[in-house]
Amino acid sequence: QAQMSAKGIPQIAVVMGSCTAGGAYVPAMSDVTIIVKEQGTIFLAGPPLVKAATGEIVSAENLGGGEVHTRLSGVADYLAEDDPHALALARRAVASLNWDGGGVNHAVRASMAASYDEPLYDAAELLGIVPADTRQPYDIREVIMRVVDGSRFDEFKPRFGVTLVTGFAHLKGCPIG
């Protein structure tokens, strides 16, 4: 993992079962980690070892399931409903990498940016979304949807650190995020 990361090779982990002991490091060190709800688990030691060491009885889901790793620890970036959803999220992650492996030249990239979809929501609505009082909260996603191409925004880690919004989109055909 570390060597591939050092070479700039993106790593995407999809956890559809149990990642235990050394295998738990793979999703933790990946650039994007997707875990399947009530199916995928990530932990260094499973429930039997926890019981043997501490006497505590804990389920695999409560010890290292999707809820734990997408809301509390932040180890996983996306929570998938099932295996097909996990694979769809993985495909979306690949599409948003903005990594061409050296295969796309700048002329091709420029022509790709020449065409784009206008936002689905009117930018004039921004005045009604962003309050004049800078201390008053508002949903930044509403602003993003009125600025980015096709109002498409792929939020990264949507369940972790909910006061912070990060993600990927396109602006006039150019990838941002």
Describe the residue ranges of each PLM region.
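Proteins with a high burden of low-complexity, intrinsically disordered sequence enriched in S/T/G/P/A and R
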Residues: Q1-A2, V104-S115, L171-K172, G177
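Residue-level detector of functional hotspots within protein domains
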Residues: S18, E61-G64, M112-S115, D133, ...
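Conserved catalytic cores of soluble enzyme domains
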Residues: Q1-G102
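Generic preference for well-ordered secondary structure
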Residues: Q11, P47, A53-I57, G74, ...
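Generic detector of short, locally flexible boundary/turn motifs and exposed helical patches
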Residues: Q1, I35-V36, I42-A45, P131-Q136, ...
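Terminal amphipathic helices with adjacent charged low-complexity linkers/tails
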Residues: Y78-I144
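Non-catalytic terminal/interface segments that mediate subunit docking, oligomerization
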Residues: Q136-G177
